[in-house]
Design a protein with these regions (language model features):
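Metal-dependent phosphoester/phosphodiester hydrolase catalytic core
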Residues: 1-280
Length: 280
């Protein structure tokens, strides 16, 4: 029953569906969700971080075991054999809880080995800036939609005001400005909205200047059709980010694919739900 579909040509209007989610600790009773997703027949599925919980960045072989035990599940095989899968990481599959990698591409010394294991296990079109500038950011297109998948861990340094690091930030700004797609989807492993996380401790609100730099670019360059995706909090939310000098931005967050642990709903959200397990 395995099959694949060719994506609509870049720039061509087409009907298709894309799923996304995060928060996927290996949890045998909940692994059936991959079969459920496959049954919905999305054209692609975006894994937005915490795709596994390795939390042991210096143990490469153990990381591989964590990947392999998921990949050997019949339910996951059904999804990955029939659906284009794209992935970025968040703290638990990059390093440990709330980790920041820092601006040095090669320090701490576990960063590059973790990146190499990640590359072994996900079929992304490319991985950041390659050997000289490792990371998991990349972009791809389906029809008239451009997807920009960002890496908010490898170069994160809140003390220096950055989530992306200078190279990735330049890449994102140039890609957004050059895009002629009707819709531009920017995906992040952590939340964009200021009220969505624990006071900005582990979200874009922890680097408000860099966040504003990206949003101001959208306003000033009149970049239409931007949609924000995120994960991390164990619930599903929809937020509206008001932009007085441009159009309001909408953020869609979901991150409880297989996890048992749940975060409380948010009154500030347009929609917030945390019962059971889910994807969007």
């Amino acid at each position: 029953n395995n099959h694949f579909r060719t994506s609509p040509c870049k720039g061509r209007k087409a009907h298709f569906s894309v799923g996304f989610g995060g928060g996927a600790r290996y949890n045998p009773p909940k692994e059936r969700i991959w079969k459920t997703i496959a049954g919905r027949k999305p054209h692609a599925f975006l894994f937005l971080g915490d795709n596994l919980y390795q939390d042991k960045p210096t143990h490469r072989n153990l990381q591989r075991v964590y990947y392999y035990r998921r990949q050997m599940r019949e339910e996951f095989v059904e999804l990955s054999a029939t659906t284009a899968c794209y992935a970025i990481w968040d703290d638990h599959d990059f390093g440990a809880n709330d980790v920041s990698g820092g601006l040095d591409p090669f320090k701490p010394p576990w960063k590059v080995p973790v990146w190499k294991v990640f590359k072994e296990n996900w079929p992304n079109p490319y991985f950041g800036g390659g050997e000289k500038q490792p990371g998991c950011w990349f972009d791809f297109s389906i029809g008239d939609v451009d997807f920009f998948m960002t890496d908010g861990r490898y170069y994160r340094d809140f003390k220096k005001g950055t989530m992306l690091g200078p190279v990735q930030k330049k890449w994102l700004k140039e890609k957004l400005t050059a895009s002629t797609a009707t819709f531009k989807v920017i995906a992040s492993g952590t939340l964009w909205t200021e009220t969505a996380d624990k006071g900005g401790k582990d979200s874009w609100w922890g680097v408000p200047e860099e966040r504003e730099e990206i949003f101001s670019l959208i306003d000033e360059e009149k970049i239409e059709g931007v949609i924000l995706l995120s994960a991390d909090r164990h619930r599903t939310d929809v937020y509206k980010i008001k932009r007085p000098k441009g159009y309001d931005l909408y953020e869609f967050e979901t991150s409880k694919l297989t996890n048992n642990h749940t975060h409380g709903t948010k009154e500030q959200a347009l929609f917030s739900y945390n019962k059971g397990n889910f994807f969007a």
